[in-house]
Amino acid sequence: INPLLIKLSVPMMVSMLVQALYNVVDMLVVGKIVGKTGLAAISNASMLCFIINSLCIGLTMGGSVLVAQCKGANDQTGQRDTIGMLFFLSLVGSAVVTILGLAIYEALFQALNVPANAYQDACGYMKIICCGTVFVFGYNAVCSILKGLGDSQTPLFFVGVATVLNVVLDVLLVGPLSMGTAGAAWATITAQGVSFMGSLVYLRRYQPGFSLRKIEFHREKLLAILKVGLPTAIQMVVVNTAYLLVTGMLNQFGTPVAAASGVGLKINTFAGMHCWAIGQAITAMVGQCLGAGQIERARKVVRSGLLLNLSVTAAVAVVVQLLAEPLICMFDGTSPEVIRCGVQYLRTCCS
């Protein structure tokens, strides 16, 4: 296994895990303070968040590939143009997702049979999250650029700071200020906004020639980003939409099952996070190899990445099987039905 691949993928994996903690922290705090009703609300809302994040990660991955190729070819102009178009795409994408999300989330929750006692909380949470979509797209754009340049540690720093802030705000807004699920949503988008602004300032210093005010439209760069990123985005959205439909069917069995499936899905997502991280590391390394014309080295990176991915997946599956019940109890240790259904869901999905 290529040591450089491990060095690049580990910070990416930790960064993605920490970034995913946004919703997990919301669920932990709300589950402990509000109870299973709030937990069911965020479990359903987080499914829409998964789809938004999938679209965002998929689209920005195209920018990461192009940035890596430009770096490998030492093409500073192409690199700058790609970064500009990636931000343009992120801005347009976030605007579309925000408008569409605000227009359909209520009808979607009704179609998903969200339990009546959790419906209003789910709507309130999702409304706030939709308004902060620009921060999600913006931060992932910066992360993709830095990863394409071979820097996987800086994104980890910024997402770590944001997660700590999210935890503090969650406890404060949901607890003493009694804002419920809405407080958890405000904590999340505030932390994401801080993460985006901080990483943007860093990128401006890291790339002296880059400025949001000097972005020029380059149709060929935009199409190149979409050519790589759009199929990935569609694939990820389709997978998460399938999970959304399953959640809708499970909601018919009541609040405990809805809460359990949401928790189980979140843990299952964490268990597979290394696959995305290693995939992004492979993308960055292969992009730079192809940009430099090193075809054989690119093939070796792919083989090493596949071996690493399979090895880690096997180890994670064993751990989840052994610790399924304690993991579910972290979110709600008071409801026997939530624990039973959650453990069954988790062990089935990770088998």
Locate the predicted segments by residue.
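Membrane-interface helix-loop junctions in multi-pass transport and translocation proteins
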Residues: 153, 163-196, 324-326, 340
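Short runs within selected transmembrane alpha-helices of multi-pass transporters and secretion channels
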Residues: 60, 129-147, 155-163, 184-197, ...
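Interhelical loop/hinge segments that connect adjacent transmembrane helices in multipass membrane
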Residues: 1-9, 188, 197-239
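Residue-level signature of transmembrane alpha-helical cores of multipass secondary-active transporters
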Residues: 8-16, 50, 90, 129, ...
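Helix-terminus/linker motif at the lipid-water interface of multi-pass membrane proteins
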Residues: 21-40, 109-116, 172-179, 237-270, ...
